[in-house]
Amino acid sequence: MALYEHVFLARQDVTSQQVESMIEAYKGVIESNGGKVEKTEMWGVKSLAYRIKKNRKAHFTLLNIDAPPAALAEMERQMRISEDILRFLTIRVDALEGEPSAMMQKRDRDERKDRERGRRRDDDGYVGERNEEG
């Protein structure tokens, strides 16, 4: 079977729970066609470089997939039909990475720096001072 990295962008209006249910549905498609999803990473809501279908932000998600090409073709067909998916990209790779992706490592570094400075980030990326009073 072939190895793939698949990234998709879901509309900003969709909740995190809905994104998780989409991931489970796409995992089901892959598994029913003889493949499996090795790793899933939700990168969160990020700003887009330009508007896509009237959206300025999107939920970014990475799937590492070990599946036959037919399974991937079916998943991509379903993503094209879905109105909640703005874009997707699938790349065939020689080996899947076992460690967290560069996006997850960057997010972890940023969170660590903020903790060291006594700051926190909210969901929109706003950095503010910690309120120690409660």
UniProtKB/Swiss-Prot annotation:
The reply on keyword Ribosomal protein is yes
Q: Which GO terms describe its molecular function?
A: small ribosomal subunit rRNA binding; structural constituent of ribosome
Indicate whether Iron appears among the record's keywords: no
Compositional bias of kind Basic and acidic residues: 105-134
Q: Which keywords does the record carry?
A: Ribonucleoprotein, Ribosomal protein, RNA-binding, rRNA-binding
Entries under Gene3D superfamilies matching the protein: 3.30.70.60
Q: Name one GO biological process term.
A: translation
* Family label: Belongs to the bacterial ribosomal protein bS6 family.
This chain belongs to the protein called: Small ribosomal subunit protein bS6
Lineage of this protein's species?
Bacteria, Pseudomonadati, Pseudomonadota, Alphaproteobacteria, Hyphomicrobiales
